[in-house]
Regions:
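Acidic/polar, glycine-enriched structural segments that form the non-catalytic walls/loops
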Residues: 1-52, 72-76, 82-93, 278-279, ...
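Mature extracytoplasmic enzyme cores
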Residues: 1-7, 11, 94-95, 110-126, ...
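Short, glycine/acidic-rich hinge or "gate" loops at secondary-structure transitions
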Residues: 19-30, 164, 182-197, 237
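Acidic/His metal-coordination segments adjacent to aromatic residues that form catalytic metal sites
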Residues: 28-49, 109-137, 198-215, 355-370
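Active-site core of glycosidic bond-cleaving carbohydrate-active enzymes
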Residues: 55-62, 67-91, 99-113, 130-157, ...
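Acidic/histidine-rich catalytic neighborhood
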Residues: 171, 175-232
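Catalytic cores of secreted or luminal carbohydrate-active enzymes
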Residues: 371-420
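Carbohydrate-binding surface patches
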Residues: 416-442
Length: 449
């Protein structure tokens, strides 16, 4: 596991300072496609899901692990990618809907407009020209918010100057406020619901739950980015927008409890869980956005309120169970770690970071994408980091989901220009080094006794 983690970090470093971000479908590393799929009779330059097209849901997993690994200097190429496209993204909103804010779509060309194949060559004349005519991608606009949060986290972690990116963050937030007020005003007299909240309809919870009303992934994204940004720029405008963000939707799921029997029949128990959305019309893919409030948005997690709700979502949500996997961009290993589920995180990380099928062991894939699969490696890195170190406010939680029988030596970064180095051997923590020394008081060692 350690070797493959390190090899994949090396692969990320090979394009450390390129003007274009490391792509999820191979980065700089490509080889004859016949070794991946015999039907793809192309040159080694070919990669599935395009050369110039970026897919945000995949790209984010390449860049999230760079925070805890301390590779902050490698992140601007991804941030600048979106910053360069900002004006075209704003023009989309102006031209199509006559309102402010940047509309970044999920599959995006390097000039800020949708991939034409996904936009649709055979579109009905009456269809909204701002929408992709695509069952997977329609209304999926919230993925830009993960990169906004990454930018904010580079300031939290390393004190980075994020001034050049503030217009990107503000415009991305503005889009949701402007657009969903507009849509509500077209349906009726009021732009907000009875509680003064935005009505995020129609929306999309990843590519999976479509035509959503108040998707939990979008709500968690807006809430977290706004709360983080307000700490940077304490502006009344953003505080007012935060007050319009609805709560993360919850639901009860019936669970058959075989230990609670009455009259020889199983008595149902009801577990409160995170719902994918307040409502939706169909399921179109195999993602689990109801766990996005855990990661990347960290509303739920070890040491936080209502941890049991998130754990019950992981264990009992029927779609979360059906979609569970270690393959490709699947994030179950990350969620298990963030929820402190040591055995789950252990087994999923072993599967995720085991040797790939090629001579170079960190060439994973193709998964859902291509080989090498960089979002396979990125999600593996994130999960391993979360097993070792998490934060809750000012607390630094060590080994929140780490098997005590696994010996390890690590050095990772935490917010506040902090690094933590420690060794775990035979279940005992030794050689704990925290820089600056003043942060040592914030360390909470969570390894099982």
């Amino acid at each position: 596991i350690t070797r493959n983690y390190t090899l994949f970090r090396y692969m990320l470093g090979c394009n450390a300072y390129g003007s274009v971000p490391t792509k999820f479908n191979g980065g700089l590393f490509t080889f004859d496609p016949c070794h991946i799929d015999e039907k793809q009779a192309f040159t080694p330059d070919y990669r599935k899901w395009g050369g110039g097209t970026m897919t945000a849901q995949n790209q984010r997993l390449v860049y999230w692990p760079m925070l805890k690994s301390g590779d902050f200097d490698m992140m601007p190429s991804q941030f600048n990618f979106y910053n360069r496209m900002l004006k075209n993204a704003e023009l989309r909103s102006h031209v199509y809907w006559q309102h402010e804010g940047a509309c970044f779509c999920e599959q995006i060309e390097n000039f800020g407009l949708p991939n034409p194949a996904e936009y649709g060559f055979k579109r009905p004349a009456w269809f909204d020209k701002g929408l992709e005519y695509n069952a997977w991608l329609e209304y999926e606009w919230d993925t830009i918010l993960e990169f906004c949060q990454m930018i904010l986290e580079t300031k939290n972690y390393a004190g980075a100057d994020i001034t050049p990116y503030l217009p990107l963050i503000e415009s991305s937030l503005t889009f949701f406020d402007e657009h969903y007020r507009l849509l509500a005003s077209r349906r009726g007299r009021k732009a907000l619901d009875g509680d003064g909240h935005l009505i995020l309809f129609p929306g999309s919870a990843c590519e999976t739950y479509k035509m959503t009303n108040n998707a939990s992934s979008t709500i968690a994204a807006l809430r977290t980015v706004l709360e983080t940004y307000i700490k940077v720029c304490n502006n009344e405008k953003w505080q007012k927008m935060l007050e319009t963000i609805p709560p993360v939707p919850l639901r009860y799921i019936e669970v058959k409890d075989s230990l609670n029997l009455q009259a020889s029949t199983m008595t149902p128990a009801w577990k409160q869980t995170i719902s994918p959305a307040k409502s939706w019309e169909r399921i179109n893919n195999i993602e689990t956005p109801q766990l996005y409030p855990v990661f990347p948005w960290r509303i739920y997690g070890v040491g936080k309120e209502n941890l049991e709700i998130a754990r019950d979502t992981y264990f009992y949500d029927p779609d979360a169970l059906k979609f569970r996997s270690h393959t490709g961009w699947k994030q179950d290993n990350i969620w298990a770690a963030c929820l402190g589920l040591t055995e789950e995180a252990k087994s999923l990380s072993l599967a995720k970071l085991s040797d790939g099928p090629h001579r170079f062991p960190a060439f994973w894939g193709p998964g859902y994408d291509w080989t090498p699969d960089h979002n396979w490696g990125g999600s593996g890195m994130i999960g391993l980091q979360e097993m070792l170190l998490q934060t809750n406010g000012t607390q630094i939680l060590l080994f929140p989901a780490w098997p005590k029988e696994w010996n390890v030596h690590f050095k990772l970064h935490a917010p506040g220009n902090t690094t933590v180095e420690a060794t775990l051997k035979d279940g005992k923590v030794t050689n704990l080094k925290v820089s600056p020394e003043s942060r040592k008081k914030d360390i909470v060692i969570m390894i099982e006794k």
